[in-house]
Amino acid sequence: MAYAIIETGGKQVRVEPGRFYDIELLSVEPDEKVTIDSVLLVQNDGEVTIGQPLVAGATVQGTVLRHLRGRKVLVYKMKPKKKTRKKRGHRQEITRLLIDSITLNGTVLTAPTATEETADATPDTETAAE
């Protein structure tokens, strides 16, 4: 299974092809393609490529699924014996991003197809009977 570690929105995220992730808001419309060049690490079939600080020639392609707001974070400030209370809430704007592929030096590492996933998930009848 191939994966990459990317930097977006001041955070580092471990991404795999075929999965979606909630990241900081991107100024891109839904259903548009996004290419992320800030790739810190790429792993494919046990071979790890680490950047210093970025991996040269590595990109991650994704599709923006939708924009949404995160859970509300409440901040409550109180000073005892003064009757001073402040309650504030904040909801972060986030983007749901589906990772299509990881590219390393022109080699595209894509998500496994549905037939491969179901073949791996079904147990072998010969080994299960023994």
From Swiss-Prot:
Q: Where is this region: Disordered?
A: 110-130
Q: Which GO terms describe its molecular function?
A: rRNA binding; structural constituent of ribosome
Recorded hits in InterPro entries, A to Z, give: bL21-like, bL21-like_sf, Ribosomal_bL21, Ribosomal_bL21_CS
Q: Which GO cellular component terms are attached?
A: cytoplasm; ribonucleoprotein complex; ribosome
**One biological process term in Gene Ontology:** translation
Alphabetical UniProt keywords: Ribonucleoprotein, Ribosomal protein, RNA-binding, rRNA-binding
Specify whether Ribosomal protein is a keyword of the entry. yes
User: Do you know which Pfam families this protein is assigned to?
Assistant: Ribosomal_L21p
Q: Which PROSITE patterns match?
A: RIBOSOMAL_L21 (PS01169)
Similarity remark:
Belongs to the bacterial ribosomal protein bL21 family.
**HAMAP family associated with the record:** Ribosomal_bL21
Query: What's the stated role of this polypeptide?
Result: This protein binds to 23S rRNA in the presence of protein L20.
Q: How does the record describe its quaternary structure?
A: Part of the 50S ribosomal subunit. Contacts protein L20.
Q: What name is this protein filed under?
A: Large ribosomal subunit protein bL21
